[in-house]
């Protein structure tokens, strides 16, 4: 995971929350598709105006209020004219300053979003934050242990609870998924035990997908040998799989 802070002239303006056009704090989800390129983007806006841009759940960019506002406007596909008007009103800067920084930000966002885009450290001149140098307003990812049951009996298992430990019902898990979204958590990983033993797993994946969350699965992969079952998970919206043996 790369943690960066956008570095351009706009960050030299006042590092304060804009006085006008105040988007509500929350988590916003966007999809980028261009030919064979596909990316999922999350922008988390904090109450103090700062933001966090997360690309494909594996690149994290910390944004000050000015950069967060501009990123929000760009991702919301506001026109150049609208963006210039809003930013000028919020920060009392010239049209030329906004236009210059908008062009820089557009280029940076385009490269960050593309799977084969420029390296954010060596090619985009982004500043690096040291790990754990800042406390995020919410986790970037939440792992949910759906069950502690397993269809293996490994001597090296790290499962901390008894296999008979009760699980929650599907509607209870959906409430938890909704709460994680409301908290600003964009990435969910279903784990266990063996999560594929829970027949409602595809339903939970689909629910998280409808929220806008990226979903992953930690599994021993035994049930994934069933192509019909695997297709069901993919159709529900599963994004990635980690096989643990």
Tell me the role of every PLM-derived stretch:
Residues 17-20, 27-31, 35-39, 46-48, ...:
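Short linear motifs at secondary-structure transitions and domain/linker junctions
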Residues 21-25, 30-31, 38-42, 109-115, ...:
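A generic short-segment signal for beta-strand/edge and adjacent turn/coil regions
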Residues 2-14, 59-143:
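Long, charge-rich, low-complexity alpha-helical segments
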Residues 100, 104, 108, 123-240:
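Conserved alpha-helical substructure of the radical SAM core
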Residues 1-72:
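Acidic, low-complexity/disordered tracts enriched in E/D and polar residues
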Residues 243:
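Conserved phosphate-donor/acceptor-positioning beta-strand/loop module used by diverse small-molecule
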């Amino acid at each position: 995971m790369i943690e960066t802070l956008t570095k351009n002239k706009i960050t030299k303006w006042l590092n304060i929350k804009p006085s006008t056009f105040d988007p509500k704090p929350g988590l916003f989800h966007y999809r980028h598709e261009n030919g064979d390129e596909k990316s999922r983007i999350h922008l988390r806006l904090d109450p103090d105006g700062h933001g966090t841009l997360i690309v494909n759940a594996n690149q994290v960019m910390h944004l000050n209020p000015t950069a967060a506002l501009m990123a929000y406007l760009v991702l919301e596909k506001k026109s150049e004219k609208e963006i210039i008007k809003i930013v000028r009103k919020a920060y009392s800067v010239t049209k030329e300053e906004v236009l210059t920084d908008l062009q820089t930000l557009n280029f940076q966002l385009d490269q960050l979003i593309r799977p084969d885009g420029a390296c954010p450290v060596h090619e985009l001149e982004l500043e690096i934050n040291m790990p754990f140098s800042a406390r995020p307003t919410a986790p970037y990812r939440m792992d949910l242990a759906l069950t502690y049951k397993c269809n293996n009996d490994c001597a090296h298992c790290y499962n901390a609870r008894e296999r008979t430990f009760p699980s929650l019902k599907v509607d209870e898990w959906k409430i938890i998924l909704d709460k994680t979204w409301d908290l600003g958590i964009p990435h969910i990983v279903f784990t266990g035990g063996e999560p594929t033993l829970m027949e409602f797993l595809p339903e939970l994946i689909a629910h998280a997908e409808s929220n806008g969350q990226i979903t992953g699965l930690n599994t021993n992969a035994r049930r994934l040998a069933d192509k019909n079952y695997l297709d069901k998970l993919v159709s529900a919206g599963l994004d990635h799989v980690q096989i643990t043996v």
